[in-house]
Amino acid sequence: VLFYYAGEFTPAMIAAAADTLKGRLASEEAGSAAKRKVFSTFIEMAQNVLHYAAAHAEPGQPQPPASGAIAVGRDASEGDAGHYWLVCSNPVHVEHIARLTEKLSALRAMSLAEIKESYRTQLRNSEHADNDALSKGAGLGLLTIARDASAPLEYSFASTPDPQARTALFHVKARI
């Protein structure tokens, strides 16, 4: 494991974590393309936690900060040696599970060429904000992660101790 963090995600935390990861990647014996992809994927995953982690405040209380976990590591097994992995986990609203599953299932079925074409199409999509009210960006985060990954993204949802069952724990894994 090169990096692990669990807790509140803020812009300052992401910047500090990015600096730490950069330093650790600098000492790795990997090509610059692999390091760039790991760093880019890390930033996208951290931004996803920051922007999409479900947090519930009691009525009249301020919204709590986004929380989650992110880890970066390198495979040591002979067949996978040199490959990096990144895992991110955060709570999501249960009503978003179907939407996330649809997006991730579609990404898993795409070839790299199809992912790149979808990315280029999305870059030109000036109506994204009108068509996807839940997305806080240009809709490029998961496409960026999938584009940089060497295998289809893995994902799962798990129950949380939320007594009202409003959230689930979302996990996504990318291999670089």
Would you name each region that the model predicts?
Residues 1-29, 107-120:
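Helix-loop-beta hinge of the Bergerat
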Residues 3, 9, 39-42, 84, ...:
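Phenylalanine-focused residue identity feature
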Residues 5, 9, 30-34, 133, ...:
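Conserved aromatic-histidine-acidic binding/catalytic patches
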Residues 13, 17, 34-41, 137, ...:
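Short amphipathic alpha-helical segments
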Residues 21-43, 127-132:
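Conserved short strand/loop->alpha-helix "switch" segment adjacent to the catalytic nucleotide/phosphoryl-transfer site
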Residues 28, 32, 49-57:
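Amphipathic alpha-helical interaction segments
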Residues 44, 48:
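Conserved polar catalytic motif of the HATPase_c/GHKL fold
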Residues 52-176:
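Conserved beta-strand-loop-beta-strand hairpin that lines the nucleotide-binding pocket
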